[in-house]
Curated annotation (Swiss-Prot):
One of its GO terms (cellular component) is cytoplasm. Pfam families: TP_methylase (PF00590). It comes from the Bacteria. The keyword Ion transport does not apply. This is Ribosomal RNA small subunit methyltransferase I. It catalyses: cytidine(1402) in 16S rRNA + S-adenosyl-L-methionine = 2'-O-methylcytidine(1402) in 16S rRNA + S-adenosyl-L-homocysteine + H(+). Its EC number is 2.1.1.198. Coiled coil: none annotated. It comes from Streptococcus pyogenes serotype M1. Keywords: Cytoplasm, Methyltransferase, rRNA processing, S-adenosyl-L-methionine, Transferase. Its main location: cytoplasm. Catalyzes the 2'-O-methylation of the ribose of cytidine 1402 (C1402) in 16S rRNA.
Length: 287
C-alpha cells in the first residue's frame, strides 16, 4: 500500500506534474498550469516544436525534453533518475490532458513505483468537454481513445461492445469517419450519436442524430478537422426503429463501398434494422 500526501509530506525527491494544455483555444490555459511550467526544472513534451509555441506565447523559458511514444521506453529511466535527484518535471501532451492517448501513463506508473509524488492539474480534456454538451447520457460513460483502423478489427471491436449500456467515446480521423460509422451501424444498429469537430476552435461543430442521418449528412458535407465520436449506450431490449426516412438500399450500397460483398452487406443491414433479409435482397436487386 502507498499513501501520497501531495503537498504536506517532506519531499526527498522531485515531483512529476501532469499539466493539461489547451485543445484549441489558448484562453483555456490556466494560471496554475502556466505557473507550474515556469517553476519545474524540465518539461517533458510530446512534440517540442508544438509545445515551444505554447511556451513562447506564455513567456515560459523552461527547458524541454522530448518524450513521446517512440522514445518513451528509453527515456523513462533517465526521467526517473532526474526526479529521484530532486528535480521536478512537468509532462504535457500536444493538446489536452496528459496520459490520455499518449505515453504519459507509463511515466506515471514508473514514478509511483519509485515512490515519487505525481500531481495532476485539472484542465482541458476533449472527451469530457464534448460529452457534457453532447446531449447523450454523461454517466456512465467509457472512453476508448482511437479505434482499430482495419475494418475487420474494427467490426470485431464493435461486436464486442455493442451491448454495453455506457455512453461510448472515440477519437477518429475525419478521413475514416464514414467507414467507421458504416461499420458501427452494422453492429450497433441506428442508435444516436454525436460527432464533434474542431472543439473549442472557431469552427466548432456538433452533429447530433442517428448514425444513418450523420452518414447522409457527411455525403453532402465532407468532414474537416479533428473529431470525436460519442455514441449512445445500448438500451435494454431495444429495437432499431425503422422509419420512412431510412433508405436501406443506400445503406447496403455504403456497406459494399466499404468493401463488403453484396450478400454480406444485405445480411448486415437486415440484421441491424431487423428486416427480412430476402425482402431486402429483392428490394436491392429491384426484383
Amino acid at each position: 500500500m502507498q499513501v501520497q500526501k501531495s503537498f504536506k509530506d517532506k519531499k526527498t525527491s522531485g515531483t512529476l506534474y501532469l499539466v493539461p494544455t489547451p485543445i484549441g483555444n489558448l484562453q483555456d490555459m490556466t494560471f496554475r498550469a502556466v505557473a507550474t511550467l515556469k517553476e519545474v526544472d524540465f518539461i517533458c513534451a510530446e512534440d517540442t516544436r508544438n509545445t515551444g509555441l505554447l511556451l513562447k506565447h506564455f513567456d515560459i523559458a523552461t527547458k524541454q525534453i522530448s518524450f513521446h511514444e517512440h522514445n518513451a521506453y528509453e527515456k523513462i529511466p533517465d526521467l526517473i533518475d532526474l526526479l529521484i535527484s530532486g528535480r521536478s518535471l512537468a509532462q504535457v501532451s500536444d493538446a489536452g490532458m496528459p496520459s490520455i492517448s499518449d505515453p504519459g501513463h507509463d511515466l506515471v506508473k514508473a514514478a509511483i513505483d519509485s515512490d515519487i509524488a505525481v500531481v495532476a492539474l485539472p484542465g482541458a480534456s476533449a472527451g469530457i468537454t464534448a460529452l457534457i454538451a453532447s446531449g447523450l447520457a454523461p454517466q456512465p460513460h467509457v472512453f476508448y481513445g482511437f479505434l482499430p483502423r482495419k475494418a475487420g478489427q474494427q467490426k470485431a471491436f464493435f461486436e464486442d461492445k455493442h451491448h454495453y449500456p455506457e455512453t461510448q467515446m472515440f477519437y477518429e480521423s475525419p478521413y475514416r469517419i464514414k467507414d467507421t460509422l458504416t461499420n458501427m451501424l452494422a453492429c450497433y444498429g441506428d442508435r444516436q450519436v454525436v460527432l464533434v469537430r474542431e472543439l473549442t476552435k472557431l469552427f466548432e461543430e456538433y452533429q447530433r442524430g442517428s448514425i444513418s442521418e450523420i452518414l447522409s449528412y457527411l455525403e453532402e458535407t465532407p468532414l474537416k478537422g479533428e473529431c470525436l465520436l460519442i455514441v449512445a449506450g445500448a438500451q435494454a431490449d431495444s429495437e432499431v426503429e425503422l422509419t420512412a426516412d431510412v433508405d436501406l438500399v443506400s445503406l447496403v450500397q455504403k456497406e459494399i463501398q466499404a468493401g463488403a460483398k453484396p450478400n454480406q452487406a444485405i445480411k448486415t443491414i437486415a440484421k441491424a434494422y431487423q428486416v427480412n433479409r430476402q425482402e431486402l435482397y429483392q428490394q436491392f436487386h429491384d426484383l
